From Swiss-Prot:
<dbReference type="InterPro" id="IPR043129">
    <property type="entry name" value="ATPase_NBD"/>
</dbReference>
<dbReference type="InterPro" id="IPR005338">
    <property type="entry name" value="Anhydro_N_Ac-Mur_kinase"/>
</dbReference>
<feature type="binding site">
    <location>
        <begin position="22"/>
        <end position="29"/>
    </location>
    <ligand>
        <name>ATP</name>
    </ligand>
</feature>
<dbReference type="Pfam" id="PF03702">
    <property type="entry name" value="AnmK"/>
</dbReference>
<dbReference type="GO" id="GO:0009254">
    <property type="term" value="P:peptidoglycan turnover"/>
</dbReference>
<dbReference type="GO" id="GO:0016773">
    <property type="term" value="F:phosphotransferase activity, alcohol group as acceptor"/>
</dbReference>
<keyword id="KW-0808">Transferase</keyword>
<keyword id="KW-0418">Kinase</keyword>
<dbReference type="GO" id="GO:0006040">
    <property type="term" value="P:amino sugar metabolic process"/>
</dbReference>
<keyword id="KW-0067">ATP-binding</keyword>
<comment type="pathway">
    <text>Amino-sugar metabolism; 1,6-anhydro-N-acetylmuramate degradation.</text>
</comment>
<comment type="function">
    <text>Catalyzes the specific phosphorylation of 1,6-anhydro-N-acetylmuramic acid (anhMurNAc) with the simultaneous cleavage of the 1,6-anhydro ring, generating MurNAc-6-P. Is required for the utilization of anhMurNAc either imported from the medium or derived from its own cell wall murein, and thus plays a role in cell wall recycling.</text>
</comment>
<comment type="similarity">
    <text>Belongs to the anhydro-N-acetylmuramic acid kinase family.</text>
</comment>
<dbReference type="GO" id="GO:0016301">
    <property type="term" value="F:kinase activity"/>
</dbReference>
<protein>
    <recommendedName>
        <fullName>Anhydro-N-acetylmuramic acid kinase</fullName>
        <ecNumber>2.7.1.170</ecNumber>
    </recommendedName>
</protein>
<comment type="pathway">
    <text>Cell wall biogenesis; peptidoglycan recycling.</text>
</comment>
<keyword id="KW-0547">Nucleotide-binding</keyword>
Length: 392
């Protein structure tokens, strides 16, 4: 096989892998994609590799301070790298590629701490081991440079969203419903820029609040299921408006952008504290209310920052929850917004591919020595090349 590395029109063109393991911590999504200047990304294959319960438990435990953290973190990072490598080998197999055909692998890692106000963010991974196991250049640690430049380090996907989802005719919002919800606002006048030169001066975005982090935690506690399949648990319940008001009484929701958040704030302890005095509620009513919380906080931010938007395109795990999507549409209408809600599949990108595609694209940007952040989104002092290289 002739190496793809010799068949490029731009020095950074070629095949890239992207790996993303989100706050659900259920596994890693991987994608193989070809980037060529002036052309849209071409997906070659995708894969999902789940995490064993032991690894998932270790990752959840590292969300909170505890004993012997350095040892536990190192062992969990090694286990993560091993699962990431399995995903990469599956991508190689299904795409018919060899490691020499891949320019680089962009890997997010697993966030275990995100505290930009203290000047750091920590995405767990052993990138050196991953490079050894795959024999592919690994580009990792994308968030730290933005934080070092005074930014939030999140969200990092808006520049990619602008590249593939922008429109010359309408203002669009891309909403990621992962563990945490975030929005990217793409004003009319943009448009897909195949080589990735997003109009960063007009793009805005930030984290809104909790999404699947709390929804999944509650359904796992009561049904021993990893997520609310189809939103059925929430559909059995009724929103409790008093509890919803208590949940919304959180300073983060009143904070101005740029802002970012994570499980450091929105976790089971936060929820349990808010539920004090609501022990009489049936679990399905709490689930319905958590779903309404996600819809309300996203709709509030869209109404505040993108009142002229006509379409909201959803990606992330929440895109597979029709009850949540209906709640979002209802919440937008209640705030006077005439905005249709659809998934990014309507724009040609399946919602489960968006995040892993974004980190493959960030690896592409690193190789091009081009900025990957949007400083107006993160609050960084300027645009920066993101990531660190671990050669094969």
């Amino acid at each position: 096989m002739t190496s793809n590395r010799m068949q490029t029109g731009h020095p950074a063109d070629g095949v890239y892998f992207g790996l993303m393991s989100g706050t659900s911590m259920d596994g890693v999504d991987g994608i193989a994609v070809r980037f060529e200047a002036g052309k849209p990304p071409a997906v070659l294959s995708e894969a999902f590799v789940g995490f064993a319960d032991t690894l998932r438990d270790a990752l959840f435990a590292l969300q909170q301070p505890g004993d012997d953290e350095i040892e536990r973190e190192a062992l969990a990072a090694n286990a993560l790298a091993a699962r990431y490598a399995v995903c990469c080998h599956e991508l190689l197999r299904t795409a018919g590629l060899s490691p020499d055909d891949v320019r680089a692998l962009g890997v997010h890692g697993q966030t275990v701490r995100h505290r930009p106000e203290r000047g750091y963010t920590r995405q767990l991974n052993n990138a050196a081991l991953l490079a050894e196991l795959t024999r592919i250049d690994v580009i990792a640690d994308f968030r730290s440079r933005d934080v070092a430049a005074g930014g939030q380090g999140a969200p990092l996907v808006p520049a990619f969203h602008a590249t593939v989802f922008g429109s010359p005719d309408e203002t669009r919002v891309v909403c990621n419903l992962g563990g945490i919800s975030n929005i990217t606002i793409l004003p009319a006048g943009g448009g897909p820029q195949g080589e990735g030169h997003a109009r960063n001066d007009t793009v805005r975005g930030h984290d809104c609040g909790p999404a699947n982090a709390l929804i999944d935690a509650w359904v796992e506690r009561h049904l021993k299921q990893p997520f609310d399949d189809g939103g059925r648990f929430a559909a059995r319940g009724k929103v409790d408006e008093t509890l919803l008001a208590a949940l919304l009484d959180e300073p983060y929701f009143r904070q101005n952008a740029p802002k970012s958040t994570g499980r450091d704030l929105f976790n089971a302890d936060w929820l349990d504290a808010k539920l004090a005095g609501f022990q009489h509620l049936a679990p399905e009513n709490v689930q319905a209310t958590l779903t309404a919380l996600t819809a309300a906080t996203v709709a509030d931010e869209i109404a505040r920052h993108a009142g002229d938007c006509r379409a909201v395109y959803v990606c992330g795990g929440g895109a597979r929850n029709p009850v949540l999507l209906d709640a979002l549409a209802t919440a937008l209408a209640a705030r006077g917004l005439d905005a249709a809600v659809a998934t990014t599949a309507a724009l040609g990108v399946p919602p489960q591919q968006v995040e892993s595609l974004a980190f493959a694209w960030l690896a592409y940007r690193f190789n091009a020595r081009a900025p990957g952040n949007v400083s107006t989104v993160t609050g960084a002092a300027g645009e920066r090349v993101l990531g660190a290289l671990y050669p094969r």
